[in-house]
Every structure is written in structure tokens, then in C-alpha cells.
Amino acid sequence: DAEFPVCNAEKGQFGATFVSSRIDGGRIVSWSGAEASNAIPSQSICELAIAADELPAPVENAERLEITALENGHAQIFAHGIGGHASMPEGTINAVGLIVTYLREAEDAFDARDERLLTPAEHEFVKFLAFVHADAYGRGLGIDATSPAFGPLTCNPGVIRVADGHIEQVIDVRFPDSTSADTICEQLEPLVGRFGVTYRVGRAKVPFSVSADDPAVKALIDTYNEFTGKHAEPFAMGGGTYARNFARAVSFGPEETGLELPAWGGQMHGPNECANEEQLKQALKIYIVAILRLNELEL
């Protein structure tokens, strides 16, 4: 469930759901994003109780937004982003964030003619969401952190919904060993208090690591380098594997980074997932020799 050479460290995981104050008679009828919290949404759909022709044309990200009229007289905003995994936001575009940006634009246009697009409760929560979606590293929320071993914290606001008179935004945070779930909660307090937002914490897992100097890690990395002719080093990642369920374990392949795939083939966990037969055969050889070497160690 990972890549070569050796992943000896996994970031901590923190999940929370932000909840708006009670919304009565709101304009935002529905709002959807990612299906799962660990997915960066490639599309987001928001239905507003207003005629489509009353909304201004988008300015920023116009090529990624579509505004259409629904049969019930409401407007639908459809955002096209670039999806990915929550732990690897590079090169992605969060579709929910595109709609947040548009709603802020539209509100400014309405304000300019002394009108209101959203109710006060919606307005405050959308302003809050602008901080949540400021970037993929938690800077807007004030929770950003980094460390040499683990790299930067990542924050994915992927799942969004309207439920029981409230708007809810879920975040998936992968954090380094320089911060903690308790610290993140403390850092969130000023912003949620400012906008009258409440939140509930879901998942919270501490970072996990095995030293790169561990004899077992050295045996694995040395074996990999011998077979590939590389000088690779162990790495940390934001994803999670079963390794963290053990006191002393790492993830070791079988995928290779930068492997050229056929046009019809997809990456691990993606549509049309495929593998290179020659690379799998090499991985088998690496595993056989690595296991024999581990067997010689006092673990």
C-alpha cells in the first residue's frame, strides 16, 4: 500500500467538522464536495435559492465555474477542480474552494448595489470558509506547521453539506511531529470564535516513525538500492498504512514513483489501477533478499 524505497514515518491525522450557526430561510439549499474526507474534490455543486440570471458572472476561476438555471427556478453553481489525495495537495484544485471564492465575489457585487445575497449566518460561515480554503497547508486557519523529518502539515476541506439547518465543512489534516491534535484545537479557537462556528473532532492519530538508523530500516533500504542501483533514502508521507498498527514497522513498496504507465492505466488507488510486470518481478526479488536479511537481525 505504498512506494519504494522505505516509508519510515507517517504524519499524524486529525479530522474535524466545522458547523455554522443555525440558518433559517437561507439561500444555500444544498452543497456537495468530496465523497470522503481524504479526497480533494474534483467537483462541487451548490444550489442557491435565487434565479440564475440574478447572479453575476464569475471573474476569478471563470473557466472552472458553470452557473445554470434549474427547473425549480433556483441557480446551480458547478465547479470543476483537480482532485487528489488529501495528503498530497500539490497540483490539485479544491472545487469547494472555487465556489467559496465565487460566493465571496457575488456577495461583493450584491453589496455594491446595497442588496444581500446570503443571510447573516450564511455570510459569516462563507467568510470563515475563505480562511479554511486559503491554501492546502492550514495557514488560513492558523494551524500550519512543518518539521525536517515529516515536512509540512496539509489540510483538506473536502466534504461539505447542508444538514438540519446548518452548513458543515469537514477537514482532513495530516500533521508533522512539531505539532499535535491538542495544539491544533487550541489554534482553531480564535477563528471559530470570531465567526461563531462550532466544531467537533473526529479522528486524531499521533505521528508514527521508525528511525532511519534502525538496523531493519537499513537492511531494507540497502537491499532496494543494491537491486536498483539507486542511492535512495527513507521518506515520510501523509498517507496511512497498516505499519502504524505495530510498534516497529515500515511500509516497503511495491510501487515505484515516476513509473511510466500505459495510456489506459492508472496509479495506485485510482481508476484502472495497473502494475508493471517487470517492476513487480524486481520487487519480488527485493522482498526475498530483504526478508532473508531481516531474519538475520535481532529484532
Question: Model-flagged regions — what are they?
Answer:
Residues D1-P176:
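Midchain, well-structured core segments that form catalytic/ion-binding scaffolds
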Residues V29-S30, A36, P41-Q43, A51-R64, ...:
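Active-site-adjacent substrate-binding region
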Residues I40, S44, A95-L98, L153-N156, ...:
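General structural feature for long, well-ordered alpha-helical segments within catalytic domains
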Residues A51-R64, L98-A109, R113, Q187-G196, ...:
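Generic non-transmembrane alpha-helical segments
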Residues P89-T92, R113-L118, R203-A212, E273-N276:
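Short histidine-centered catalytic/ligand-binding loop motif
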Residues R161-G239:
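Substrate-recognition/cap regions that form aromatic- and gly/pro-loop-enriched pockets
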Residues A163, D222-L297:
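Zn-dependent metallopeptidase/amidohydrolase metal-coordination segment
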